[in-house]
Every structure is written in structure tokens, then in C-alpha cells.
């Protein structure tokens, strides 16, 4: 089974702002380019899941349009299944605030307890890992799946593959790599099992 982890296109937000579940649109042209690039590559029979945030849903809809109108592929299995477990982490009160305006003390507390601390008051990395692990466990055992999602969710998948739900000892344990906006990563399960 192949899991396609697709990151939404660049969001239409000022550089340097904290956003996780802040529901902002993605750049329409960048979304179209991503859909044009990925749609022909998606396997027949794949199931499409997307975050509940509009920047992910825009890409899911653009992929559907590419398959239907350009490629003339009527794969009704690629109707998107909205799954809020694929939403980005929620930064609570810090959503929409410039990163450099968030007090250093808030970052210090978060990095000292990166696993459990709810940065912004709503969701911890542990909470994110648990919901992403649940979404992974609910994937079909056969066929391929496509997740239209966010960098934090993709990092969570990569962490779960390596460590399972083991608590993060430090913030440095958290993966820093994620696909760039409008790109993707494919994982073969059988090679990568979720603990």
C-alpha cells in the first residue's frame, strides 16, 4: 500500500505569521500547478483524503477537476473524504500572530516540554501524533491512499514511522523535513509500519 502525503500549495498569508489551523486559502495558481503535476501520477483506485482546512480542500478539488476534464478520468474513488485528523496542529492564541511577536518565554516552555505542552493553549504535539496515528490505522489495508494535508501532519507520520508514540525527549527529536508547498512524499507500507 502506498500513502501519498501531499502538502497543500503556498497559503495566501503574510510571511512570518504563525498559522496552523488558521483557515486561509492557498494561492489558486499554485494549487492548479500542483494538481496538474500530481493528477496524472495518482494510481487508479486510490482513495483521496483531505484536511478540513480550505487550503487542502482547494487542492483536492483541483485534482478532481484535472482528472475529470483534462485527463478524462472519471475515478469516482477520488472524491475527497474530509478528515479533520489531517488538519495542521492548532496553535491556539498564537494563530495569525507574527512568530517574532510571540514571547520568547512561550517558546522556551514549549521546547522544554515539546511533547506535552499546548503551545497557544489548544493542542500539543502529543495530541497531533495521536490523531495522526488514528488516521493511519484507519487506512484501508489494500489499495493506495492520498492525503492532502500539512507539513505538521507529514512530520507526524515520519515521526510515527521511526518512533511510534514514544514521547519526544526533546524538540530536536521532531522531524524538520517536510515536502515543500505543493509537493509530496510517498511511503510504501510494508516498508514503513506504524507502531
Q: What positions do the PLM features span?
A:
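Acidic, low-complexity terminal tails and accessory targeting/binding regions
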Residues: 1-2, 69-72, 89-101, 141, ...
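Active-site-proximal alpha-helix that buttresses catalytic centers in soluble enzyme cores
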Residues: 2-72
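Generic beta-sheet signal
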Residues: 3-4, 46, 141-152
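Generic structural signal for well-ordered alpha-helical scaffold segments
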Residues: 35-39, 129, 133-141
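Short beta-strand scaffold positions
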Residues: 50-51, 130, 148-149
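Active-site signature of alpha/beta-hydrolase-fold catalytic machinery across serine-
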Residues: 62, 156-160
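Phosphate-handling substructures
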Residues: 66-131
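GST superfamily/GST-like fold recognition
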Residues: 151-155, 185
